[in-house]
Amino acid sequence: MRTYFYRVIFISCLLLVSVFSLEGQENRIAIDSISIQQDSNKVEILGSDRLTLLKVDDTTSIQILAGRVRLRQGKALFNCDSCVLNNSENIFEAWRNVQIKDGDSIQVNARHLLYKIDKKIAYLDGGVTLSDRKAILSTPSLEYNLNTDIGIYTNGGKVVNKKTTLTSKEGYYYASLKEIYFKNDVKLNDPGYKITTDSLLYNTATQTNRFIAKTTIIDSSGRRIETKDGYYKGGKAEFNQRPTIIDGSTTITGDRIAFDDSTGTSQAIGNVVVVDTAQGTTLVTGQLFRQDNEERMLATGKPLLIFKQEKDSLYLTADTIFTAIQPNAVEKDTSLLKNTTRISVSKKDSTLRYVEAFHHVKIFSDSLQAVCDSLYYSDKDSIFRLFRDPVLWSKENQITGDTIWLYTKNKKSDRLTVFENSMIISQVDTGIYNQVGSIRMEGRFTDGNLDSLRAFGNAETIYFLQDEDSTYTGINESKSDLIDIYFSIQALERIVLRGAVSGTVWPIQQKNPAEMKLPLFKWNDLRRPKSRLDLLQ
């Protein structure tokens, strides 16, 4: 077909030469309704400087137009420098300054056009641009269907929309929807973010990006997002199919993640996993709310926080877990429980975090377990503060009090302080318990294992005496200013009473061991998490 048209062009050029040779003749021709078809697909010649009619054979005649050519087909207008219309082939071809105006908003420009009149399909090449008043598409060649308002390029293309530039090897432009489907080596550059993917849907009117393939997004802050499905628009986004967000040392993965940069908030839903490599923690939860600019996170839906250690990781669960950057100032607040703290608003240390856990708090590690109603932990002092009916277990030993502070060092238990109504109970046999109670207790750990404990203030004990054969010989029921308790492999080994001591050593036959209980005795074994699985029940 192209060979045929080049022959026609050659003939037409000869004819044009004869036209140009006529001096003093008015060349501009105003033509209102000359057409090469008589149906709804007819092409009307609106104007041209020169028009030549040429009959090639009995079945073929062509019209050659040159100079300011204007054509119309339906709502589409065509402009060019020269054009050849072929009524038998139902096509026309145009050269130089080619322009198609499709309705009020679409304009296509190129150096060359081959147009199938009956199918309303335009094949353009040579510096092709398509504009919809919102964005400009540039490509070496373009197929544009005026019936469907769909443009297709397969030799690479670029779209510029304000400050956003998109490139791909293939593209499909849907004019009525103002959407472009970019395919194969898609790249988006914007001052606020960059996108790399294999497939992308982009709306030129709303500047919305829709992801339908594996996609990587890197924003101006360095935050990296990996997703397979979702959308991104003006700082608002929603991602599906387990996207991942990497923000500094924090990696967040969930079934669905949404964020709004204007408010600095994000939300992750469904099997959420948050890994903080700087802090050595992993958070697993059903739902996560995050204040990104403040690095605050609120986890609900059976959250599990893991403090990773080389040998003995610590697992923490609660109804709700909150974590944030640690403020510098910590001051007393007497309106709260004794020994609790209030965090003042001040300049923050971006390397330290704190954790708050609320309701049904459980802790599990191989060396110790604990439960309480609420908990506070800070990287600043590495102390776990357990509030409201706390219980801590270390092997056979149960420790209770109004408040318990567990000090850690190098991610291992180091010290222990129990405030008010302190008590330690060690089960030595069925229904037989060694017990020490006091106002306050302080303990020490060696290599993460409970080594010793000192009881202060109104200290009292019930201790079962055994001979070398482990036969029970008596019961020591005493009071003292101080009581020191020593452990061997975390089992209670001996008790030493210091200061003023009063009490009685009862022969084992005179007392019922099951009745030997201190006033605050309560065995909480049913509350104790026995494994990591117990934390999730």
Identify the meaning behind each predicted range.
Residues 24-537:
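N-terminal amphipathic/hydrophobic interface segments
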Residues 1-28:
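Bacterial Sec-dependent N-terminal signal peptides
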